[in-house]
Amino acid sequence: MTIPTISELKKDRIIPHVFPNDKIDLNVDLFISFKAGKEVNHGNVLDIAGTGSVPRNIKFSEEPPDGYCFVLFMVDPDYPSRLRPDGKEYIHWVVSGIKTKELIKGTQKNCVTILPYVGPSIKKGTGLHRISFIISLIKEEDKDNITGLPHYKGEKYITRVKFNNYESVHNIAQINNMKIVGYNWCQIEG
């Protein structure tokens, strides 16, 4: 596991598409693996098969400090395509209240699943999509009260395309006094 460098983030245009500038201080390494050992690793290309269910294992290089917890976001900044990302960041999954260095099958004691997992569903011909995993720190008392996220009322009623007009994890982090501390991504083509 290694933390992505600013030059890596610029090369794959994570900066400016996910983070607006290089004023990002990533210090928590993030390891993600799906079924059959498919690992997310700094923009590697994965086949969409096997990403339909929650990642089997997510590891962090460290635990959050006392009084804080991690919030894990999984988003697609290339929705509906990288050339025309009109939907801004499509939200695939949000889990809050993570207090340990490992999340097995998407949960652990005291975690709050704010938005249940929805795997990538990418239309053919839209090119590679950068599926992004973002870790932020939030005060533990605020773990289930994050402003700007859509409210989950069952799959039939949810619109995941928008962060209630806040457009991105970066903006959600700012309005909720969260600090983004970790990032990893893969690319998936429909």
From Swiss-Prot:
Q: Which domain of life does the protein's organism represent? A: Eukaryota
Q: Does the keyword Hydrolase apply?
A: no
Q: Which Pfam families match?
A: PBP
Q: Which GO terms describe its molecular function?
A: lipid binding
UniProt KW keywords: Lipid-binding
Q: Which CDD domains match?
A: PEBP_euk
Task: Name the SUPFAM superfamilies for this protein.
Answer: PEBP-like
Family assignment from sequence similarity: Belongs to the phosphatidylethanolamine-binding protein family.
Quote the protein name from its UniProt record. Answer: Putative phosphatidylethanolamine-binding protein
Name the species this protein comes from.
Plasmodium falciparum
Query: What taxonomic classification does the UniProt entry list for its organism?
Result: Eukaryota, Sar, Alveolata, Apicomplexa, Aconoidasida
